[in-house]
Each structure stands twice: as C-alpha cells, then as structure tokens.
Amino acid sequence: NVVHYTFELSEVNIGRRYDSCISGVPLKDLTSKSDMVQDALKEFDGGKLIIKEFPTKSANINKIKFHIDRLVSSDFEPGLIIIDYADLMISTKAMEQKTWELEAIYEELRGFGMEIKIPIWSASQTNRLGLDGDIIGLDKIADAYAKAQVADFIATFSRNMVEKEKNKGKFYIAKNRIGVDGKVFGVDFNPAAASIVLQEFDEQVKLEGDIQSLYKKYKDNKEGWG
C-alpha cells in the first residue's frame, strides 16, 4: 500500500499519472481509452493507493503523522510513503535560513520513517549547475548538503539533448548507506505515459561504452568524487 502526498499538483493530476503508468496508455488518451485503462487497473495486482493533496508550504510532519494515524485506524497499513516533495513542506521549528529549514524537514521525515518502520521517498530539483550536466551529482542538487547529510539513499535522473530525442536517460546512484554508490544505469523514459524504466542487462551492456565515457569525463573533472 502506498500513500502519496502532493504539495504541487492536484490529486486528480497525480492520479492520472498513475493510471497512465500502470496501464501504459498515454496521458492524452486516458479519456478516449478509458475502457483499456479500467481493464489494466483491474488486472493490476499491486496494493492500494491513497493520494492526499496539501497546499504548497502548508504541511509539516505533524500533518503527515495525523493523516497516517487516521489511515492506520481505518485498517489501511501503508508500506511506502511518497512525499511530492519535501522541499515544499514546512518545518515544525522556526528557522532563519532556508537551508536550515530544509535540513529540519528531512530530519523530521527520516525520524518518522524510522519510528513507523516505513520507507519515505521524496524528490528534489537541481541547482543551476545541474541544468546542463550529463550526470547529476550531490553538488548539483539544490541545497544539497542539508539533504544529503540526512538521506540514506539518493539517486538522480538526467537527460542530455540526444537522450531526450530517443526517450532515454541516466539513473545515477549518488549516495547509498547500505550498498554500492557511484553507479550509472541507462533508463527508458516515456514522458507520455509517466514511465521511467531501468534497462535490462543486455540493453545496458550496449550502452556501457557511452555511459562509462560520460562517467569518466565527470569523474576526471570533479574533486572529491565518492
């Protein structure tokens, strides 16, 4: 079971993206091919999904806790919480600087996840340096230090102009407390169906040369690679 909190898009828009991703029907065709979507959703053997919308910069960890408690009391046991996204929350503490507030928000989310033993995932944006980057490292995540120190796992997704034309991209493991990091994987990206899929091993091997050259180029031009 998944709980998806959205602080930017509406519940309807988020729901449409899930419908498209699960069914494979492009977003623009969801209405005209509603029967196909319904059939795909009926066959879907995953858990249940709750989408909850809060206005931007109106929710803190206490609101999330309260809502989760209500779901649990209604016999809905979440196995994953998605925060879309943490930068648009507010902290329970008054902070003078944005960086401090972001660090507090991520610490509160991580603490709550440890308390209820449920993974919490969020997304973030790059800073200006990351807009033209082939591989997005921790230094290119907006207000990276405050977030990176708290997060257990960080992965980045990026595309150059050639990859955009081919609906491809790169998935880079920037931090991993319980496993290997510094790895780059090719992905198939279908924006029409809100889908990002890691490539199969044989497809990955075909792209290994290009990806490794990008990896080496990035590594050779960065200090403190890790």
Stretch-by-stretch model annotation:
Residues F44, N62-P78, M114-I116, R128-G226:
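C-terminal regions of RecA-like/P-loop NTPase motor modules
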Residues G79-I118:
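Helical hairpin unit composed of two closely spaced alpha helices linked by a short loop
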